[in-house]
Amino acid sequence: MDTFGLKIIASDRVFYEGRCRKLVIPAPDGEKGILPNHENMVIAVKIGMARMEIEEGNWVEVALGRGFAEVVNNRVTLLVDTAEKPE
């Protein structure tokens, strides 16, 4: 399956930078799913849990603060207040 570039930037560090197969992020109007070759867009991100599939069947959860996601040219950049691994 195709992948896309994903970069998660918190206010204090780059949390993740690499390839991703699927991404689900919390948005004010519900969860948004992003797949490879998604159309370009900007999405508001609300506080909540994001899920990303790095390898087939290997899902990773990330606790996100407020921010936004930019989807452009098969790359997704998440700019958020905080990004943490859930405990």
Locate the predicted segments by residue.
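Compact, glycine-rich, soluble single-domain proteins
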Residues: 5-87
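Intrinsically disordered, compositionally biased charged tails
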Residues: 1-3
